[in-house]
Amino acid sequence: MIRLQDIADMAGVSRTTVSNVINGNTKRVSQETIDKITRILKEQNYVPHMGSVMLSGHGSRIIGVVLGFAVTHGMQALQDSFVGELVGTIQTEAERNGYFVMLIGGEKIDNVVDMASRWNVEGLIILGYDEKRYHQLSRKLNKKMVLIDAYPEGEYTFQNVGVDDYSGVYQVGEYLYSCGYRKALFVAETDRDSDARRWMGFKQAMEKNGEFCSRSRLIIVPGEKTGRLKKYEELLPRFLRARALAFSSDYDAIEAMNYFFDQGIRIPDQISIVGYDDSIFAEFVRPKLTTVHQDIHQKGVLAYRRLIKMIAGESMKELNIKSPVRLIKRDSVKE
C-alpha cells in the first residue's frame, strides 16, 4: 500500500504539502502543485487512511444513525422490518454518495455524544427520540440532526421526516365503518407519539357519522410478545364482539392473526384485521393483510438528503416533511 511519503517523493514536495492537498488546505499551495499531486494520487490509486481523515478536522463523511431504542415489539430493533428497511435505505443512499454510516445506540444520550465526537461524524439521523430527548442531546452535541417520526408538544423546532399518521388510520376508520364495523377497536403498544395520532384518526373517522368512539376502544397491549398474547387471550371475547381490529403496526397485526389462527378463529370471517406500514410481510401472510402503506424507502432517502443539505450549509425553511399514506385493501377485511 502506497504511503503519503511516497506520494510526496514522487511530487517533489513535503509530506505536509501532500496532506494539505488531500484535506483541502490549499490556500498556500500553487495550482500547479495541486494538479501534480492530484494526478499522482489518481495514478497510484491512493486511498487516505480514515483515521487520519477523521482527525484532520475536515469532513469525515460519516453519518451517524441513532436508534433511540434497542428493543421493539419485544425483539432487537434491527429485526423489525420497518427499522431494518429504513436503516438499509439510509446506508445504501449514503454509500452511493461516498458517505459511511455508523449505527449508534441512542438509549443513553451520553453514548451518542461520545461516539459522534470520537468519530467526528458530520451529522445524525435519529429514530426513536421525542422532543425532550432531542433537546437534551442538542445541548450536549453541536451536530446537524434530522429526526424521523418525532412529535413536538407544540410547533416543530427541529428537522423531522415523518408521515401523515392521522390520515392513515382515518382512512382505516372510514373503511371499517363503511363495511359495517361500528364497534371496531384500535390496538397499539402505546398511547403516545405516532400511536396517539393514529388513534385520533381512527376515533374521528368513527365519529364522523355520529358514532361515539370512547377511549375504551383504544386497546394498549404490552411491548413484549408474551404479554401481548396473554392480552389477546384475555380480550378474545371482546374482539369477537367487535368483529374488527385496527392495529398500529403490521407486526402486531400479523402476530394477532397467527394467534387467532391457532385458536381456530377465521380471518376475516370472524374478525377483520387491518395493519399499518405495508411491510414486506403484509403480502406473505394469509389472508393477505389490508394495511396502510407508508413509503419507508422514501422516508430514509428524504432523511439522508435533508441531512446532507444541512451539512452543506443550506437552510431548511420547512421543519417537518410529512409523506402521504394510503390504504391498501387486500384480504383480511370482510366487506
Model-derived segments and spans:
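Short beta-strand elements in bilobed, periplasmic/extracellular small-molecule ligand-binding domains
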Residues: 91-105, 183-185, 203-227
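Flexible loop/turn connectors
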Residues: 233-335
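An alpha-beta-alpha
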Residues: 170-210, 319-332
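Hydrophobic alpha-helical segments within soluble ligand-binding/sensing domains
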Residues: 160-186, 226-233, 253, 294-312
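Alpha-helical recognition/docking segments in bacterial nutrient-uptake
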Residues: 2, 58, 62-174, 234-241, ...
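N-terminal helix-turn-helix DNA-binding module of bacterial transcription factors
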Residues: 1-60
